[in-house]
Amino acid sequence: MVLAPAVVAVLFAQSPGGLVSYEEAVRCAGLTQAASELEGAESPEGRALYDAALYWSLAAMRAGTAAGRTSQAAENDQTRARIEGVRQLSADAPAARAALRQCRERAPKLD
């Protein structure tokens, strides 16, 4: 899916907590992608996680561009964060669950 840069900028600016660092955006992208993958898209919860993952993925790509990272490097960072997120969430790590909750709270509702 390709979204116009203006749409991505609007999405990124809508974060209730304001702008975030590249590292934080990648962490949220990884956690929400991992949670979405683990939940599946069949349930309302899974769809909400998918929306949050989409938002954070776009925000991370936008933040990466602003930080001078290539799109490939930003994608690789998200992949690593997702793999780590799957490990942590599968192990029911309290810190990962808390971080996921915060990421979801900061993502705008896309429905």
Where are these regions (language model features)?
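Secondary-structure transition/hinge residues
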Residues: 1, 37-40, 111
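Classic N-terminal secretory signal peptides
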Residues: 1-19
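Residue-level marker of positions within ordered structural domains that often coincide
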Residues: 6-7, 33-34, 108
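Compositionally biased, low-complexity repeat tracts
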Residues: 13-14, 26, 81
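Short N-proximal segments of mature Sec-exported proteins
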Residues: 17-69
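Compact alpha-helical subdomains of small soluble proteins
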Residues: 49-111
